[in-house]
Amino acid sequence: MSNKAEATNQSSFFNLHVEGVGYLNRVRRVKPKKGQEFLACTVSAMRGSTDDIAYTKFDCKVSGAEAQKIVKMLEADVAAEKTVIIGFKIADIYPEMFTFEKGDRKGELGVSIKGRLL
């Protein structure tokens, strides 16, 4: 019975984390209309065979203290278009629809995978 009582008194969360290795891109500061400015980036995660690597892009808000420190440290290298590979952990991923505003796909719908870089 004590386990049931303990479970009732504790907050429960379902955590979804993605861990891997990928390229760090598009380091930027985002200024929303409401709320505070935050650091963001794109991670192109590598997956599949090393002979035929595929990539999945994640658009991330940089949340973790260590992630903030590391991304800020690597920001100049990303801006200089150097290849920057990182180990990462992304939490709370979700899809977000958007409309392409320019290029060959202008007006088409797309999907971005959002998350928090820890």
Name the predicted role of every residue range.
Residues 1-118:
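Single-stranded nucleic acid-binding surfaces, predominantly the OB-fold ssDNA-binding core
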